[in-house]
């Protein structure tokens, strides 16, 4: 059924992520990943593709190191959430169960089974998720979202390019955080929602690691062409109004 409390599911996801970042104790973060990430999976299964943000922030913060023992111990805390995600993916809802769910919603809450609930019949398996999207792909959609990502993420891309991460190369950082979005583009038709979630996670994560001084922004950024252009007040105002 649709879980539309507090607006959208992603509001809950973002709130949990902010709570996680506010935790100061590594043990508390371990408990969070073990016991609360499974809850996020039950709220919205694709959140598993954004676990990479947890991993990057934790690595920069020193929650784990790149060695066999530390990495295995850290990844072990994701097993409950990933196990639930795999179980859901490998056990799609049957037509009979879907009908019973729709009847239950109607009789007890007077709600119709629509949107995500309705799509469960045609997009319940992993294969169906990909297959249903193939006919939607065309040049116009690719161009549109390429420009949306380029313009929308442009300032963040510039910041990352001129940033020096304590433990990561910026190219590796970009690769790690952008990989999930391309997988979700192949699986989901609501690309606008994906971009919104991806952008919010990216901004929250970058601001957090900047606040914690895990990244240093070079003064060379002031020499960037786009930064120079936007420093002109009237151009910045026009750009702000348009976008």
What residues fall within each predicted segment?
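Membrane-water interface signatures at transmembrane helix termini and the short loops
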Residues: 2-10, 143-210
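Membrane-interface transmembrane helices that cradle and orient dolichyl/undecaprenyl
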Residues: 18-32, 62-65
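Transmembrane alpha-helices and membrane-interface helical segments
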Residues: 19-26, 54-58, 157-158, 199-220
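Membrane-interfacial loop-to-transmembrane alpha-helix junctions, especially the N-terminal start
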Residues: 29-33, 70-74, 165-176, 194, ...
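Membrane-interface alpha helices of multi-pass inner-membrane proteins
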Residues: 31-56, 182
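Perimembrane helix-loop-helix junctions
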Residues: 50-79
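Membrane-lumen/periplasm interface segments of specific transmembrane helices
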Residues: 70-156
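Signature aromatic-anchored transmembrane alpha helix within multi-pass, membrane-resident enzymes
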Residues: 75-79, 215-243
